[in-house]
Amino acid sequence: GVPCLCDSDGPSVRGNTLSGTLWLFGCPSGWHNCKARGPTIGWCCKK
């Protein structure tokens, strides 16, 4: 999957760990949406 920035990772992608994974059709079972706003396409989810 494509890594994405969760709210808990910090305000920007620079110098922060991207702990989320981008899913186009919502988070799979057992995962949760970890970003309150965005991304434009898909959902940023983590286990």
Curated annotation (Swiss-Prot):
InterPro entries named among the record's database cross-references: Anenome_toxin (IPR000693), Myo_ane_neurotoxin_sf (IPR023355)
Species name: Anthopleura sp. (strain 'Zhanjiang') (Sea anemone)
Protein name listed in UniProt: Delta-actitoxin-Aspp1c
MF terms in GO: sodium channel regulator activity; toxin activity
Protein function: Binds specifically to voltage-gated sodium channels (Nav), thereby delaying their inactivation during signal transduction. Stimulates mammalian heart contraction.
UniProt entry keywords in alphabetical sequence: Cardiotoxin, Disulfide bond, Ion channel impairing toxin, Nematocyst, Neurotoxin, Secreted, Toxin, Voltage-gated sodium channel impairing toxin
Family statement drawn from the similarity comment of this UniProt entry: Belongs to the sea anemone sodium channel inhibitory toxin family. Type I subfamily.
Domain of life of the source: Eukaryota
S-S bonds: 4-44, 6-34, 27-45
GO cellular component terms, A-Z: extracellular region; nematocyst
Coiled coil: none
GO biological process: regulation of signal transduction
Subcellular location: Secreted; Nematocyst
Transport in keyword set: no
